[in-house]
């Protein structure tokens, strides 16, 4: 298909037939571009593609609120003055050990948003530092394909506040759920999804930032095919003088999407290629509907990677700095690479050629995001004007990473970040004002009471039963999946075309397991495991785990304790012990 160029023309014609909706989308996109640091106009090709709908699991609407309760439940969520009156709360959409998330409407723009209350931010300095890092990165990385912080509520006290209220744009679902709910995604979907991810990654890497945890659950999605990368809780800004060991000691990796060099500390300096590998794994999962490398442990992960790619060349082995990892791979039985055309049958050859470049075992052989965007696979989409870059982030922004922080240090740094969303107060702060928080009315006190009321009703089910979601990362809405995590519905053999894509707005029938799971939830029976381990999987503000996650027999996450390992070299020790 040459990258789907002919169907793009068809999408464009479809777009012109929908001039009314298209103009609305264009105007909304223009407002977005005006409010960000980027001047990225929506190209007609992209707008046309986004008019082709995909299935996203839908949330039930909350039960109607009785008129005499409306004031206490919704209208008085914020104070009657200042910033708080800007948002009208609708319902709680997630709750966990970190806090609670509510869906709301911005009364000035009509936009739906997610307001996330993070409880006791400073209870653990490490988690508070991660929140600081993510708030800062999401402020600095403003891009159409990266989730955006709309606002952060000003706390009532500069030196004593404990909770944070962050306002995000509200997305419908995530890519993990989209893959499971759609068994008829087309090559045009695959192409457009990958294009957006690489466009975001080009911008992130130009800033010298590594995301380090790219996976389908950390990519938000809407039914118009729009994707946004979220969860920068593990991201790092890379500077040339930063020691590699320090840079990676707190790395909590998602094994299934982890680059091979991270499975054993293979190379002396890590590069943006670690994110490129993750994108390759995600692209392969889009093509097949299943994870490409579902390793059960580090050794198994390396085994299944080499089963597909073959054993590394002698040149690659010679560059591996870790002796144990080098010896393990050297003694591995010789494997020949499996042709991608055999692994991914009936797939566009251009897509497979690009996938091979994304999944090269040696990081130096992987394409950069910019190089991948120039690949012939994107001939019908590529446009440098809508693929912005940026200057590297200043090292001064992350000077706090170089010193040991106290709770008060982190509180002051987070307060400074919050003021970025309050320009008048920021000016006072820069002048050295000590009482600035009392010059500007804060709605947080009333906000706390309203959240407490909503949480109580949420637990009692008075505003509608919360939807089941196995992996809940907010501000994403919660959706249901089958027990085994995969869509069991048999695919139809019908021809997939632009017209069929346009009709994919209704979720497919659930599998038998999913139906049983759903009926159990309706009867008030739940099987969630309320473990702190599930809650603490992520301290991210844009994608924290908010409900319990049932233990998986083959977990995709490895938890690497800084105290236990000291450095990422400990992974090689694990490889050696498990192999012996």
Curated annotation (Swiss-Prot):
Phosphothreonine: residues bearing it: 249
Inhibition and activation profile: Activated by threonine and tyrosine phosphorylation. Activated in response to hydrogen peroxide, salicylic acid, jasmonic acid, ethylene, fungal elicitor and infection with rice blast fungus (M.grisea).
Active site (catalytic residues): 213 (proton acceptor)
Motif (TXY): 249-251
GO cellular component: cytoplasm; nucleus
Gene3D superfamilies, alphabetized: Phosphorylase Kinase, domain 1, Transferase(Phosphotransferase) domain 1
Name of the top EC class for this enzyme: transferase
Residues recorded with modification Phosphotyrosine: 251
EC number: 2.7.11.24
Post-translation changes: Dually phosphorylated on Thr-249 and Tyr-251, which activates the enzyme. Phosphorylated on tyrosine residue.
Induction: By hydrogen peroxide, salicylic acid (SA), jasmonic acid (JA), ethylene, abscisic acid (ABA), fungal elicitor, infection with rice blast fungus (M.grisea) and wounding.
Acidic residues bias: start-end ranges: 554-566
Cross-referenced PANTHER family: MITOGEN-ACTIVATED PROTEIN KINASE (PTHR24055)
Domain commentary: The TXY motif contains the threonine and tyrosine residues whose phosphorylation activates the MAP kinases.
Protein name listed in UniProt: Mitogen-activated protein kinase 12
């Amino acid at each position: 298909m040459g990258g789907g160029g002919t169907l793009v023309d068809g999408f464009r014609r479809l777009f012109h037939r929908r001039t009314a909706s298209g103009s609305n989308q264009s105007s909304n996109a223009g407002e977005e571009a005006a409010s960000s640091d980027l001047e990225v106009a929506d190209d007609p090709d992209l707008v046309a593609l986004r008019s082709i709908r995909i299935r996203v699991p839908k949330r039930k609407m909350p039960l109607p609120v009785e008129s005499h309760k409306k004031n206490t439940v919704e209208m008085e969520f914020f104070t009657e003055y200042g910033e708080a009156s800007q948002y009208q709360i609708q319902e709680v959409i997630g709750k966990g050990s970190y806090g609670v998330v509510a869906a709301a409407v911005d009364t000035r723009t009509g936009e739906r948003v997610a307001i996330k209350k993070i409880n006791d931010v400073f209870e653990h300095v490490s988690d508070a530092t991660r929140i600081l890092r993510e708030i800062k990165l999401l402020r600095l990385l403003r891009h159409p394909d990266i989730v955006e912080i709309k606002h952060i509520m000003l706390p009532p006290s500069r030196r004593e506040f404990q909770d944070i209220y962050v306002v995000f744009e509200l997305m419908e679902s995530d890519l993990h759920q989209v893959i499971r709910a759609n068994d008829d995604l087309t090559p045009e979907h695959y192409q457009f999804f990958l294009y957006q991810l690489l466009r975001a990654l080009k911008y992130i890497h130009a800033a010298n930032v590594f995301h380090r945890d790219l996976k389908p659950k950390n990519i938000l999605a809407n039914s118009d095919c729009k994707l946004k990368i979220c969860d920068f809780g593990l991201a790092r800004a890379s500077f040339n003088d930063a020691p590699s060991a320090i840079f990676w000691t707190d790395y909590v990796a998602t094994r299934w999407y982890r680059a091979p060099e991270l499975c054993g500390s293979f190379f002396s300096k890590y590069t943006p290629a670690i994110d490129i590998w993750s994108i390759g794994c995600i692209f392969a999962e889009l093509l097949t509907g299943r994870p490409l490398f579902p390793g059960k442990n580090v050794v198994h992960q390396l085994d299944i990677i080499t089963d597909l790619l073959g054993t590394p060349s002698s040149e690659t082995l010679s560059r591996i700095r870790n002796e144990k990892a080098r010896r393990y791979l050297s003694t591995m039985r010789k494997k020949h690479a499996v042709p991608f055309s055999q692994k991914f049958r009936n797939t566009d050859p251009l897509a497979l050629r690009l996938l091979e470049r994304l999944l090269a075992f040696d990081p130096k052989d992987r394409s950069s995001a910019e190089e991948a965007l120039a690949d012939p696979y994107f001939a019908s989409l590529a446009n440098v004007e809508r693929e912005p870059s940026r200057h590297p982030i200043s090292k001064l922004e992350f000077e706090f990473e170089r010193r040991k922080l106290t709770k008060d240090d982190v509180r002051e740094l987070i307060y400074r970040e919050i003021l970025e969303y309050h320009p008048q107060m920021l000016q006072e702060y820069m002048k050295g004002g000590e009482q600035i928080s009392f010059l500007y009315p804060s709605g947080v006190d009333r906000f706390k009471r309203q959240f407490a009321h909503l949480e109580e009703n949420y637990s009692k089910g008075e505003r509608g039963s919360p939807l089941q979601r196995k992996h809940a990362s907010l501000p994403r809405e919660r959706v249901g999946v089958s027990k085994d995590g995969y869509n069991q519905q048999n695919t139809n053999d019908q021809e997939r075309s632009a017209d069929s894509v346009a009709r994919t707005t209704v979720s497919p029938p659930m599998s038998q397991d999913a139906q049983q799971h759903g009926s159990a939830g309706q009867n008030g029976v739940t099987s969630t495991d309320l473990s702190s381990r599930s809650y603490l999987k992520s301290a991210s503000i844009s994608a924290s785990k908010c409900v319990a996650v049932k233990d998986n027999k083959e977990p995709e996450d490895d938890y690497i304790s800084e105290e236990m390992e000291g450095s990422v070299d400990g992974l090689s020790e694990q490889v050696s012990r498990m192999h012996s």
